[in-house]
């Protein structure tokens, strides 16, 4: 399964959240990531709260593309409460 993203959306995400989607993609490989559905949208979207390879705790929003690839939509640094939730889940 490949992870893809729109280059324009990646540039916007970097401007708005200072998070590179290429680095954020590694959250999806975190075996301890907390995954959940994001019901706030018309299309099925999912959230992953986890760590990048560099140890940065992020929230990544993604969807499944028609060809089964994952399409990253956005990523941002986790809030204090989200970081706490991730740390507690790791115990």
What are these regions (language model features)?
Residues 1-91:
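Ribonuclease/tRNase effector modules and their secretory precursors
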């Amino acid at each position: 399964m490949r992870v893809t993203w729109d280059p324009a959306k990646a540039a916007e995400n970097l401007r708005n959240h200072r998070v590179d989607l290429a680095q954020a993609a590694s959250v999806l490989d975190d075996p301890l990531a907390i995954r959940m559905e994001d019901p706030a949208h018309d299309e099925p979207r999912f959230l992953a709260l986890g760590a990048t390879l560099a140890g940065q705790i992020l929230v990544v929003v993604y969807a499944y593309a028609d060809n089964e690839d994952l399409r990253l939509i956005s990523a941002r640094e986790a809030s204090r409460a989200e970081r706490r939730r991730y740390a507690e889940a790791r115990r």
